[in-house]
């Protein structure tokens, strides 16, 4: 689960991190009062969407010459003018795709005197089985480009979970950042604090880009991105309330209600599979035969008829879907249950696109019999390769 920048900063501020004063607004009418509550005279007006690249982004409704989703303002009137242009419009960034995202919230923040911009993130480094700091002196820009063009400028410092962030770890991170003076002193409290927040809140990612050294020598968190482990949200009611469903795909929201592992993609073949590995293999073979998957959908091993039907309805609700491939290997999951769920969903929502079903495993013959006797236009497949060929051929006509 992702949250907005202003929410992430409020959470970090609760741990004692140095962040600027700021106010989140939902209406243009709130912009003037928000700016007046800040020290000024420099302000930053930031679009709040769950995507990076906001500063370089462009608004669909504005001219190509218009400023992006993060703007400086040198007066309160300028803050209001920016708010009028940004709120309610669609921001397109490198991460949103062509559709972009509507800006429903702005964060008006006090400006900062920046001397240096750094990149700092915490994530789970699965290669060593530890939480690690990923740091670079090249902050405030596209870290993916830095990793591609100058990977030597990115360093990773893994943290021993038993010891936590030690003085030696802080020294290593500070050295990587080339910190000195007041910034090096700030580091002694900031980095252990970030590690503590990451662990206590069950984060999957904490990204600060940029972490700045101000002209007075001190550190400040200028931007913050947080992603939380969805499987751990049951013990974080304070985090769950921060969820903004308007930023999420409606199909993914519905899938979460049924405990389905569903991710919307850009292709045209809907997939319903049991098991993440088989789901990825199914998507791979669709690509092998020249098409793209419209989704990742793992119904899990113990799904009942209702859950299968819900998954099928979510897939068919995607207007991009031109065909559906159901690929089930029944172990815990029984093939007859899958068949009954698919038929129930088809009878409810109709079948307007080709449907290919491959069943194997527990109760496979019963599952095939149920499908054959349903009277529905369902194409059976013998194996995964056969299934992929048939759904691609059906779409190609």
Curated annotation (Swiss-Prot):
EC id: 6.2.1.5
Reaction catalyzed: succinate + ATP + CoA = succinyl-CoA + ADP + phosphate; GTP + succinate + CoA = succinyl-CoA + GDP + phosphate
Co-factor: note: Binds 1 Mg(2+) ion per subunit.
Binding of ATP, residues: 46, 53-55, 109, 112, 117
Cofactor: Mg(2+)
Entry GO MF terms: ATP binding; magnesium ion binding; succinate-CoA ligase (ADP-forming) activity; succinate-CoA ligase (GDP-forming) activity
Annotated InterPro entries: ATP-grasp, ATP-grasp_succ-CoA_synth-type, ATP_grasp_subdomain_1, Succ-CoA_synthase_bsu_CS, SUCC_ACL_C, Succ_CoA_ligase-like_bsu, Succinyl-CoA_synth-like
Any single biological process term in GO: succinyl-CoA metabolic process
SUPFAM superfamilies, alphabetized: Glutathione synthetase ATP-binding domain-like (SSF56059), Succinyl-CoA synthetase domains (SSF52210)
GO cellular component: cytosol; succinate-CoA ligase complex
Binding-site list for Mg(2+): 209, 223
Keyword annotations of the record: ATP-binding, Ligase, Magnesium, Metal-binding, Nucleotide-binding, Tricarboxylic acid cycle
Sequence positions that bind substrate: 274, 331-333
Pfam families, alphabetized: ATP-grasp_2, Ligase_CoA
Homology family: Belongs to the succinate/malate CoA ligase beta subunit family.
Function: Succinyl-CoA synthetase functions in the citric acid cycle (TCA), coupling the hydrolysis of succinyl-CoA to the synthesis of either ATP or GTP and thus represents the only step of substrate-level phosphorylation in the TCA. The beta subunit provides nucleotide specificity of the enzyme and binds the substrate succinate, while the binding sites for coenzyme A and phosphate are found in the alpha subunit.
NCBIfam families per record: PRK00696.1, sucCoAbeta
Subunit structure: Heterotetramer of two alpha and two beta subunits.
HAMAP family linked: Succ_CoA_beta
Protein's UniProt name: Succinate--CoA ligase [ADP-forming] subunit beta
Gene source species: Rhizobium johnstonii (strain DSM 114642 / LMG 32736 / 3841)
């Amino acid at each position: 689960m992702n949250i907005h920048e202003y929410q992430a900063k409020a959470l970090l501020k609760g741990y004692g991190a140095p962040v600027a004063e700021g106010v989140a607004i939902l209406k243009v009418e709130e912009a003037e009062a928000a700016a007046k509550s800040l020290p000024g005279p420099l302000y930053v007006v930031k679009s709040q969407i769950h995507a990076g690249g906001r500063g370089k982004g462009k608004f669909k409704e504005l001219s190509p010459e218009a400023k992006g989703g993060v703007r400086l303002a040198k007066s309160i009137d300028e803050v209001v003018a920016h708010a009028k242009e940004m709120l309610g419009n669609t921001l397109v960034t490198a991460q949103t795709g062509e559709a972009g995202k509507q800006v429903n919230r702005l964060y008006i923040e006090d400006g900062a005197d920046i001397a240096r911009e750094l990149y700092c993130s915490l994530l789970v480094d699965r290669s060593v089985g530890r939480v690690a700091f990923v740091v670079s002196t090249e902050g405030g820009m596209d870290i993916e480009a830095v990793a591609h063009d100058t990977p030597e400028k990115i360093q990773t410092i893994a943290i021993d979970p038993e010891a936590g962030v030690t003085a030696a770890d802080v020294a290593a991170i500070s050295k990587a950042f080339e910190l000195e003076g007041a910034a090096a002193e700030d580091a002694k409290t900031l980095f252990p604090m970030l590690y503590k927040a990451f662990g206590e809140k069950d984060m999957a990612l904490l990204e600060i880009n940029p972490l700045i050294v101000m002209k007075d020598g001190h550190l400040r968190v200028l931007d913050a991105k947080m992603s939380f482990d969805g499987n751990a949200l049951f013990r974080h009611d304070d985090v769950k309330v921060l969820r903004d469903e308007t930023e999420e795909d409606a199909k993914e929201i519905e899938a979460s209600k049924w405990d389905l592992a569903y991710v919307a993609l850009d292709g045209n073949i809907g997939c319903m599979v049991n098991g993440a590995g088989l789901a990825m293999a199914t998507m791979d073979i669709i690509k092998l035969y020249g098409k793209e998957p419209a989704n990742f959908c793992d119904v899990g091993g113990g799904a009942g008829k209702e859950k299968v039907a819900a998954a099928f309805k979510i897939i068919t609700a995607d207007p991009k879907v031109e065909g559906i491939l159901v690929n089930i290997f029944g172990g815990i999951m029984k093939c007859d249950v899958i068949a009954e769920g698919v038929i129930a969903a088809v009878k409810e929502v109709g079948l307007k696109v080709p449907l290919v079903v491959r069943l194997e495993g527990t109760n496979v013959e019963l599952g095939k019999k149920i499908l054959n006797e349903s009277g529905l236009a369902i194409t059976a497949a013998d194996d995964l390769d056969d299934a992929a060929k048939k759904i691609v051929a059906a779409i190609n006509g």
